[in-house]
Amino acid sequence: MQYSFTEKKRIRKSFAKRPIVHQVPFLLATQLESFSTFLQADVPGTQRKPEGLQAAFTSVFPIVSHNGFARLEFVSYALSSPAFNIKECQQRGLTYCSALRAKVRLVILDKESPNKPVVKEVKEQEVYMGEIPLMTPTGSFVINGTERVIVSQLHRSPGVFFEHDKGKTHSSGKLLFSARIIPYRGSWLDFEFDPKDILYFRVDRRRKMPVTILLKAIGLTPEQILANFFVFDNFTLMDEGAQLEFVPERLRGEVARFDITDRDGKVIVQKDKRINAKHIRDLEAAKTKFISVPEDYLLGRVLAKNVVDGDTGEVIASANDEVTESVLEKLREAGIKEIQTLYTNDLDQGPYISSTLRVDETTDKTAARIAIYRMMRPGEPPTEEAVEALFNRLFYSEEAYDLSKVGRMKFNRRVGRDEITGPMTLQDDDILATIKILVELRNGKGEVDDIDHLGNRRVRCVGELAENQFRAGLVRVERAVKERLGQAESENLMPHDLINSKPISSAIREFFGSSQLSQFMDQTNPLSEITHKRRVSALGPGGLTRERAGFEVRDVHPTHYGRVCPIETPEGPNIGLINSLALYAHLNEYGFLETPYRKVVDSKVTDQIDYLSAIEEGRYMIAQANAAIDENGQLVDELVSSREAGETMMVTPDRIQYMDVAPSQIVSVAASLIPFLEHDDANRALMGSNMQRQAVPCLRPEKPVVGTGIERTCAVDSGTTVQAFRGGVVDYVDAGRIVIRVNDDEAVAGEVGVDIYNLIKYTRSNQNTNINQRPIVKMGDKVSRGDVLADGASTDLGELALGQNMLIAFMPWNGYNFEDSILISEKVVADDRYTSIHIEELNVVARDTKLGPEEITRDISNLAEVQLGRLDESGIVYIGAEVEAGDVLVGKVTPKGETQLTPEEKLLRAIFGEKASDVKDTSLRVPSGMSGTVIDVQVFTREGIQRDKRAQQIIDDELKRYRLDLNDQLRIVEGDAFQRLARMLVGKVANGGPKKLAKGTKIDQAYLEDLDHYHWFDIRLADDEAAAQLEAIKNSIEEKRHQFDLAFEEKRKKLTQGDELPPGVLKMVKVYLAVKRRLQPGDKMAGRHGNKGVVSKIVPIEDMPYMADGRPADVVLNPLGVPSRMNVGQVLEVHLGWAAKGLGWRIGEMLQRQAKIEEMRSFLTKIYNDSGRKEDLESFTDDEILELAKNLREGVPFATPVFDGATEEEMGKMLDLAFPDDIAEQLGMNPSKNQVRLYDGRTGEMFERRVTLGYMHYLKLHHLVDDKMHARSTGPYSLVTQQPLGGKAQFGGQRFGEMEVWALEAYGASYVLQEMLTVKSDDVNGRTKVYENLVKGDHVIDAGMPESFNVLVKEIRSLGIDIDLDRN
């Protein structure tokens, strides 16, 4: 087994019983693949598939002018490289995007040409089509400097759907069936039955009309309509009664209305008897062809065809007419013998279309189309052209109607056609087929569709959503181009004069900036990033709304298995509408979710893996991943638990066709990080997976001792860690950069064989948490491709580490852990275990005002020297300064208008000159409740404005850093070149050279070492070929130097040009503060099992309960939090964590007494290879074993994968290994070694009972009391009510609400109540009076009229009631 460089350092012991058959796919693949298909940037123009941008262009172009003599054709498009890289865009508040240019061709035809069109002229040109935001390598977008994510949308797939109203519409509870044809874009077509069984259709939820109008409009006559929906009874008329053609199955189950006889007149079925199978057999035996029926059997029948008098050509009776006595009379008079009527019955052949035809008043195709026109455009006169145009545009025009590839495939599958391709518009037979199926449903044949089945819902990803927006923009452009194309020839216009890119840019900008699906990326920790990008939402444009979504849509559906996580979804109004993709889920070409399965042939599991969509899955019998298999892959059990079409059952192995790839296949990333998930109640697991996303990265991340084995995948795929692009040797490493000399076999010829990784240092995330990368390699380390070189936020040695491992005791402690409160030891705070750094960004802009420009300066009047001491000469705070609330960060003055001066001020101005008073201080100060250290300052200056010293210094530092990178690359390139050169020169014969090298001398190593490297090129070689090589190497080095100089120049140009700032802004300064947040009472914490709580008290270490060896617990939790919540996983995690730490302590003890490496090896083998997945420790060298042991002394990390975790027996073994009997006895453990004797820290007495003790991975959540705590002195008031505003953001007051007033009333505290409702709230005069009284030392309240009372009076007056105060 291959271990990567970092895995070797700390192997996670896995308890998995199943081998890994299928690696977890790259977690961000959905986003990245979708967007790259949209752009197709790396595909040459001619080879692009009709997807994404290419599809949008080809669907709109060519654009033809109204007169048809000019057309604009699309050739190809190209994307330029972005002007700024991702980091620069984030700093400058720009969008990371690329300019889109399309090559278009203007073709003008000759108007004078008499016969076929002749091309007069062709102009081809590249036209700018706006900017397209680019996706970062981690699947997000940088829009206006902030990272955003486009969430995928789960919407109803295009196609045809059949459903019923579940009996809710009509009081009788009758099922009303309906069908709906949903296109990808265009008008929806609905068909529905009403309670009277008449079939209607409606277009786009407009007024309903009988469906036969639509059938006539597509060109069917009433006869054809009936022929399509009914079978006919054939009658031959006699003088009295008639002969009915005998069709056996139409009679079965009917009640005979007369005696049925055979040819000889023998009665086979008596009148009023039900006809059964024996009767039918008798009739068939008697070779009955016709049955004689009496006259009244014909009455009430419905004619299937028009009946025409053969002699006169007159229509005697029309199709769909009822047969009456008069009609029969006419028929006999005309000598008509054969008639056909509709066969209907009450059971499975209803007369629905026939009754609908009766309701329909239109006569022919034209009348029907006019009726449809009147419904769509009420009030407009129906001219013939308008009627035709509207009808064709509804379903038959490619511009207005598009079923899409998916829609056509779904439609054809649903109506039972074999081919899955076809035209993208609706065809006449599509409409007919839909109505036929709907009528059959009403007749009781077939099933309605399940809307929530994942085969009926598809996912729209970034690429598709962006393409729709881009197409919408292009369509707007098309309209404008059509108008102008007419003038193209006369005014000699070029293509760029015709196309205005504004509509495209605005459509794209609106989508990425303010669409409901474009969300501010959740960047609290790496897990929250990954989850956000894997999210699937049913909300958004064209989706559901929270209010209208019912219970069914939100519920877990059997088809979610392996596609959408049944656990992870938000609590609250969005529950079930926002989901997360399952670990192995992936999208097929149609946008349906698929999940992988292993093929099973003859009850033997193969290695073939097939991805099945929800519809395909329904056809197979699928076993679960934990089915027992022998070493040959044969299914062992007699009965295997399996699923078919959403039902679970036990079947014999020979019926199994597929098997799950992994037990964790059904859950999402967040849920698969919860160890022992199988022992937790689903509601708590939901909370657990949601709360992991809120974990704040700690200062020193610590890997979870009990994990699930997904941690590494998660950390690496999120992009927080730094991975090696190519293998090589670490040449240089410091806190900020890693330089790797690439292996020769991986280096590309002619390119620099150097990879430089600049690490992210103390950068602010979207949620103000700190993103910081730390190298985990040393100089000289050999790394291979994909190895982790540096840890990021919340990662430890390349594994996700959201919290800290805490020693947890389950016991009550003086009521301090009542109701989920958490008691924490002071040691945890002292060791900075949960300390986190938060980075706040503060901005100030200097604008150009009417009265003159604002100025950023140090020269501010009335500012204390202490405040000025922190500012440099440009008026900007120094980096490293520690600041408190109210301190000045950037000095800024704004000119203020001339005011009327008081005599005192006039005197001051006379003495001190002009400057003092015509500006006001508008400096950037630290907001209330915030303090921290300044860690970075950025200054942006508009083009043409003089840079201050600070801005210049920042640019110089940046250039210095860049030069350092280039020098490193050059150093390594030159080093390699001179090594190659030395190998080539040694032993060659020289014709002469520096230091008096004689002709004919052989060059040796000593001579070369004595010379300066650059003088090697002066050696003249005898061998011409070698001399040419020497020249080539010299040229390549000079070429590289030249390239590096050019790159440096370009960087300098980019930095020294002015910054793009919003209009009217001259300068912008950003100051970054690092705020250190220690754990304190009021902070929210949680485990991974939904066990959340609030820190209630931080207890001195000497008061905490401790073990017999003096080790105190870190956290004390209430045992009552476990049973009722049913998240027992936390208890198992504590046991296994206890074993993990115990093993670590034993390894630490071995290292301390310097045990022999063999002893260490055998102990590690016992841990790793006695049960669960085996590890290949044989391949490790002694040094590697030693390094592994050093990393394990803090606890052996375990992996207990979801649904395939450690058993009780395995945990017992590990506990026995970790705590041999002597240690167990010393700690007073119980026989199963998971409970310990504890002593009270305050009295030293032993607790009566043993306590469950162990290690749990505990998280600090992003709900910090510091961010919520808030107090107000004087602040803003609401305009209307004059009451203080509410909330921390508005610097608001505390609300004294209705119930609080009741409390004071109940106490009878009348004066407190009075001041609360008047002077402390909205009595405007009273408020100012209080201040006056206090200044005068007179402590009296003059309470007046509260403003809200005046508002109430005004409201009542606005109702027309005159209310006035009697002021006597």
Swiss-Prot record:
Biological process, per Gene Ontology: DNA-templated transcription
Reaction catalysed by this enzyme: RNA(n) + a ribonucleoside 5'-triphosphate = RNA(n+1) + diphosphate
Enzyme's top EC category: transferase
CDD domains attached to this UniProt entry: RNA_pol_B_RPB2
A GO term from the CC aspect: DNA-directed RNA polymerase complex
EC number per UniProt: 2.7.7.6
Record note on quaternary structure: The RNAP catalytic core consists of 2 alpha, 1 beta, 1 beta' and 1 omega subunit. When a sigma factor is associated with the core the holoenzyme is formed, which can initiate transcription.
Name recorded for this polypeptide: DNA-directed RNA polymerase subunit beta
Originating gene: rpoB
